[in-house]
Each structure stands twice: as C-alpha cells, then as structure tokens.
Amino acid sequence: MTLRDLINKLLGRETSSANTARERLQLVLAHDRVDMSSLTTDLLDKMRKEILDVVAKYVEIDFEEVAVSLETEDRMTALVANLPIKRTLTGEIEFKKNHDNPKKK
C-alpha cells in the first residue's frame, strides 16, 4: 500500500483501477531497469568490502557475523547488510582528528 492509498483510504476515497495499474506498471518498469545479471559475485564482494570499510571508520564491527545478501520480494530487489556493531568509535575519531591536525598557536 502506497502513502497515497493510505491517505485516500483514511479520507474515504477509493483508488481508481487506472491509478492502481499505473503504480504497478511503474514498479515493473523500475524492476526491469535494474539488470540483476550485471551484479556478479565479484561486484557484490567489492560492494561488501567498500561498505564495511566505510562503516568500520565509525563503529567496530563483528566481522565474523557480517552478512550481505540480495533479497528479492514482490518484484523488488534489495541489498541487505547485517552488520553487528560491537561499539562506536566516535571518541577515537575525535581524538585522531584533534591529534592529526593540531591547532597552531
């Protein structure tokens, strides 16, 4: 159910079949634009590594429990990343930032 459908339902309006058909067609077209065959194992591994590199700058990750996968449901494909966080590194980031760039007096 889209936000528009929810608003229409709350206001007592019925969704026309034309609008429903248009929304379904938009979903199909969006799905067709994504060429899933181009997402090779090598590309997924590269994406996984880059995502982990970025997230690891800010939090400590339990790398043994990381899971990255492609999930398809109702004509929609999602890249799902489950990254268990051990702790945040914000204090260490601030410390490094202050000591790497000392203010001149």
UniProtKB/Swiss-Prot annotation:
It comes from the Bacteria. InterPro entries: MinE (IPR005527), MinE_sf (IPR036707). Keywords: Cell cycle, Cell division. It holds the Pfam family MinE. GO terms for biological process: cell division; regulation of division septum assembly. Gene3D superfamilies: Cell division topological specificity factor MinE. Prevents the cell division inhibition by proteins MinC and MinD at internal division sites while permitting inhibition at polar sites. This ensures cell division at the proper site by restricting the formation of a division septum at the midpoint of the long axis of the cell. Belongs to the MinE family. NCBIfam families: minE, PRK00296.1. This is Cell division topological specificity factor. It comes from Prochlorococcus marinus (strain MIT 9515).
